[in-house]
């Protein structure tokens, strides 16, 4: 086992604080509408330019191991805030630095670290409750656009695009961000349920100009098996032909004789048919077939539950207003499934999301909810260069997370004002002893840090602005973009409550642990020169055998 280097007390805390400051100072220059960019060197390709706090934090590793431990713990704050709310990483880092700096001063002055931590925790718990009372629901498109704009670093077009996307696919719909091809941002919306399986034969195409199959008011046959024998399908085909409607077959596969017969029937105009493979694999395929059945009011023909294809009737088939199939995708528009059944299915999938352990599973389940509940919107980010594209895409993703958080828990006044109001309301909060009171004061003073940093990044004097904002009440604050005072909500400067709450909670959690640290242990660096010397000595000993 390698030898260890151990530091105690003040020596350890000084080193740790130095690491915290290096990371936080690099991250906090990005805060606010006039925050600066940070350039990150990459081992290959062009450097990345970013204004995203967590991207900067993730790049930082320090040579001194004790300092690095401090930096890594604050990096954890940014990552946690990012995971919880998708934004607010810079705010969380600034809060953590402020609490740690003030807290370590109090420890150096002889306060009990455990009581300081209890005081900080008490102040933060009270602050979270206050934030909830200040929170205003965020439901209209205008507020959503404002939140998106602020999170995308005051880019109004991004805010409007996100609001439009949410408007089209609903709060539950999936919104994804992709690289665009032009210079302008674009929004593509797919309504209805779309899955990534195309037609099994190009002979099904009935719209040659678009290369697609379009079926109006079709019946939909869902089968959890391979279909290769046409005899199994004859009763259903005859019933559909009598009804005079087209038929869409979604099965594990349709092959051989069955596929050939369907193609011939379609080309002769006897019955209009199209066949596609079912989406997904294994258990996920079964689940997605069931989703389609719920959406279209049909039944999955599955041998597992004792159903046979030959005995299927028109009642077992689903229906939709329209189906569009191209080479790679199938879209079912306006399924006739009952609303109550669809909502029940959505609630069931939501329960699975709660219990899911892997991010991949959670993401796939979320997609299924969106396909059932709303639709899918794709924001295509346009930019002139690849470097700009990466930077802009990161901003759009941040803005998307922030708007989701805003819809979930509401919004508070932005620009650091909400925390200032919370701190002033908690001015009379007291702990069980004087050391806890100091901890409470440390946390309340730290709540001013985000506003001060935003102002500092504007090139203004933080103390003057902070005192002016403290002198006002309600949503009165400082608009750093225009450098004027006023009502933050009216000026459209909003922060999602969830983002502010998560930033404060994670910052206080890690800061509390660091304030109560008394000892740090790390591996001693290996001394390569000493190792080489030892090897040389051993070689000399080999020669001694000849002397005896």
Curated annotation (Swiss-Prot):
One of its GO terms (cellular component) is cytoplasm. GO terms for molecular function: ATP binding; ATP-dependent protein folding chaperone; isomerase activity; unfolded protein binding. PROSITE patterns: CHAPERONINS_CPN60. Its EC number is 5.6.1.7. Keywords: ATP-binding, Chaperone, Cytoplasm, Isomerase, Nucleotide-binding. GO terms for biological process: protein refolding. The keyword Transport does not apply. The keyword ATP-binding applies. It catalyses: ATP + H2O + a folded polypeptide = ADP + phosphate + an unfolded polypeptide. Pfam families: Cpn60_TCP1 (PF00118). It is found in: Cytoplasm. ATP binds at residues 30-33, 51, 87-91, 415, 479-481, 495. InterPro entries: Chaperonin_Cpn60_CS, Cpn60/GroEL, Cpn60/GroEL/TCP-1, GroEL-like_apical_dom_sf, GROEL-like_equatorial_sf, TCP-1-like_intermed_sf. Disulfide bonds: none annotated. Together with its co-chaperonin GroES, plays an essential role in assisting protein folding. The GroEL-GroES system forms a nano-cage that allows encapsulation of the non-native substrate proteins and provides a physical environment optimized to promote and accelerate protein folding. Forms a cylinder of 14 subunits composed of two heptameric rings stacked back-to-back. Interacts with the co-chaperonin GroES. Belongs to the chaperonin (HSP60) family. NCBIfam families: GroEL, PRK00013.1, PRK12849.1, PRK12850.1, PRK12851.1. This is Chaperonin GroEL. The lineage of its organism: Bacteria, Pseudomonadati, Pseudomonadota, Gammaproteobacteria, Enterobacterales. The gene is groEL.
């Amino acid at each position: 086992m390698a030898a260890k280097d151990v530091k105690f007390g003040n020596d350890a805390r000084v080193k740790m604080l130095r690491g915290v400051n290096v990371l936080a100072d690099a991250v906090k220059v990005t805060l606010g509408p006039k925050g600066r960019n940070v350039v990150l060197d990459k081992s290959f390709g062009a450097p990345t330019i970013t204004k995203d706090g967590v991207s900067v934090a993730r790049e930082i590793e320090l040579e001194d191991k004790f300092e690095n431990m401090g930096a890594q713990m604050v990096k954890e704050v940014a990552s946690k805030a990012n995971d919880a709310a998708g934004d607010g990483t810079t705010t969380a880092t600034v809060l953590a630095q402020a609490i740690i700096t003030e807290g370590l001063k109090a420890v150096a002055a002889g306060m009990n670290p455990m009581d300081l931590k209890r005081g900080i925790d008490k102040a933060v718990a009270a602050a979270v409750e206050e934030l909830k009372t200040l929170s205003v629901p965020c439901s209209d498109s205008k507020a959503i656009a404002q939140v998106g704009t602020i999170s995308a670093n005051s880019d109004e077009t991004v805010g409007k695009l996100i609001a439009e996307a949410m408007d089209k696919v609903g709060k539950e719909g999936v919104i994804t961000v992709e690289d665009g091809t032009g210079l302008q941002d674009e929004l593509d919306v797919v309504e209805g349920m779309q899955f990534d399986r195309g037609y099994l034969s190009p002979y099904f195409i009935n719209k040659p100009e678009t290369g697609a199959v379009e079926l109006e008011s079709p019946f939909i046959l869902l089968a959890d098996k391979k279909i290769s024998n046409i005899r199994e399908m004859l009763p259903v085909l005859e019933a559909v032909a009598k009804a005079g409607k087209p038929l869409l077959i979604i099965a594990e596969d349709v092959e051989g004789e069955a596929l050939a017969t369907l193609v011939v029937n379609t080309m002769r105009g006897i019955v209009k048919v199209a066949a596609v493979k079912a989406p997904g694999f294994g258990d996920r395929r079964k689940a997605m077939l069931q989703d389609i059945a719920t959406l279209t009011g049909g039944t999955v023909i599955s041998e597992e539950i004792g159903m046979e294809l030959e005995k299927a009737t028109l009642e077992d088939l689903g229906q939709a207003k329209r189906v569009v199939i191209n080479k790679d995708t199938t879209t079912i528009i306006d399924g006739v499934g009952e609303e109550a059944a669809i909502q029940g299915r959505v609630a069931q999938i939501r329960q699975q999301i709660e219990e899911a352990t892997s991010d991949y599973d959670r993401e796939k389940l979320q997609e299924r909810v969106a396909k059932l509940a709303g639709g899918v919107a794709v924001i295509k980010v346009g930019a002139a260069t690849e470097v700009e594209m990466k930077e802009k895409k990161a901003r759009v993703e941040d803005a998307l997370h922030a708007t989701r958080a805003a819809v979930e828990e509401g919004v508070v006044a932005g620009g650091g004002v909400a925390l200032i109001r919370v701190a002033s309301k908690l001015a009379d909060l007291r702990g069980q002893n004087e050391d806890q009171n100091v901890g409470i004061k440390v946390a309340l003073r730290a709540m001013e840090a985000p506003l001060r940093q935003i102002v500092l990044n504007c090139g203004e004097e933080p103390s003057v602005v902070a005192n002016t904002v403290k002198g006002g009440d309600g949503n009165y604050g400082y608009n750093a973009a225009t450098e004027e005072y006023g009502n933050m909500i009216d000026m459209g400067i909003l922060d999602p409550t969830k983002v502010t709450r998560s930033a404060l909670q994670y910052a206080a959690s890690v800061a509390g642990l660091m304030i109560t640290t008394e000892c740090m242990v790390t591996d001693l660096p290996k001394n390569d020169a000493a190792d080489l010397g030892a090897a040389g000595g051993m070689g000399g000993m080999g020669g001694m055998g000849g002397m005896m």
